[in-house]
Amino acid sequence: MLQLFIYSPGLGQPTMDPGCLAALIYCALAVPKDEIEILRTANSGMSPTHKLPALWDGHVWIGSLKNILIYLKQKGYNLDNFDAKQLANVMAFTSLLEGSVNDLWLLEAFVNEENFVEAIRPAWSKALKFPHNYLTPNALQRQAKERLAQTLGIRDEEVSYEASRMPISHKWTNATRHRQALLRTQARRIRISSLARQVYGSLESLISDSKFIFGEKPTSLDCLFYAYLSFHAFTNELPQATLRPCLQFNSPKLYAYLKSLRETWFSDDSNILSPLSIKVQPENLLTIARLAWNNVTAKANDTRKSITKFSVPPERKLLWARNGFFIFASAFSFVWFVISNGIVVIETEDDEASFEEVDDAKESIQEKEIDETTESKATHDSSETSSSKELPKEEEKESSSFDLQPLSAQDLLFSGFAEDEIMDEEFGYDDDDDEEFDLDDLDDLEEEIV
């Protein structure tokens, strides 16, 4: 069984959203009553587009009115049988209804602050449960302002100051502010009326004398006509209504067509919704948490969009570019000065390899020198040891060659002189200056020895 999820009723309509109303009317006319169930909800989190209407076929979710109509036609629930010319008209007027006609309603209902505060927000809050009654109206107003900023170029600051939002103490006493608010409101009404007359005139050209647009049977285009234009024609709660009088006086044929559809589909005698199973989707903590999370993510996306849309004056961009160029040039010149003067040396892998080879060569040379010194020292030590061994042998030979004989005192004495002469000859020692040896002393010495 198919399940269609739509917003709750309000503002004199079965549902307070034009897209939901179009899907509801089409399903009531095309789908058998035992094959579809209508669920009223404020939770749009189940929809792939996060907007209602949404359709669940038991396996997959379908979001947005356009996708729902295409899916139902593919399943065989088709109200249309157009030829080529009719199909071209349907596509053109469908685009007009979903575009300009819907923009006019959003402009009057959600952007006009007095209408929103006094009529639209209370109606939504009354139809929805907590916490949807606080979150959904403001979310719809935010979406409407974003859409109109793209389609009609209306900025938020153009409609943010209204007479209804003035403090009571200033509303009537401050004549200047009150006059400015009234002028803005009047200018917006003129703009809405001008755009509405053009749109209504184009739509009225398609209305014929037949009961429906293309004959005696309703089509998807009839559903769209009534869904989008009924809010213009039959909403009585707005304190500043501009679209309804404009439609009544400037396009009476179109207004009569809408009244005829209302009597055919929603009169007390023949209501196409009465056979349908319409229920209210139960709310639980999970759906409330999902809604809260969706609102948090929506605000985060809005903040991200506002940051990305931040515009910088051209003069400031030029200043930033100039400063950036000077900073880059200064940094480049400093780096070039440091590298060119050798203050910082950038080593590559080849340089590191060459340095390693040089270090290895130095180490090998040092090792060779150490080996040579150790070898020379070893040879020197060995030679000294051999010489030291030979010297005692020679001394022994010399000592053995001389026989010790007893010497007299005179021999000992003169032997000393002989040694002195030898020392004088070898070392050039001259003792001529010494005192002459006294012979008397020599005789005394001999006597003492004897």
Swiss-Prot record:
Ranges of biased composition (kind: Basic and acidic residues): 374-383, 390-400
Main location: cytoplasm
GO cellular component, one term: cytoplasm
GO biological process, one term: mitochondrion organization
InterPro entries assigned: Glutathione-S-Trfase_C_sf (IPR036282), Metaxin_GST (IPR033468), Mito_Protein_Transport_Metaxin (IPR050931), Sam37/metaxin_N (IPR019564)
Cross-referenced Pfam families: GST_C_6, Tom37
Cysteine disulfide links: none
Location(s) in or outside the cell: Cytoplasm; Nucleus; Mitochondrion outer membrane
Record carries keyword Ribonucleoprotein: no
Residue span of region Disordered: 355-407, 423-450
Keyword Nucleus: yes
Family: Belongs to the metaxin family.
Role: May be involved in transport of proteins into the mitochondrion.
Protein name: Metaxin-like protein C409.19c
UniProt lineage: Eukaryota, Fungi, Dikarya, Ascomycota, Taphrinomycotina
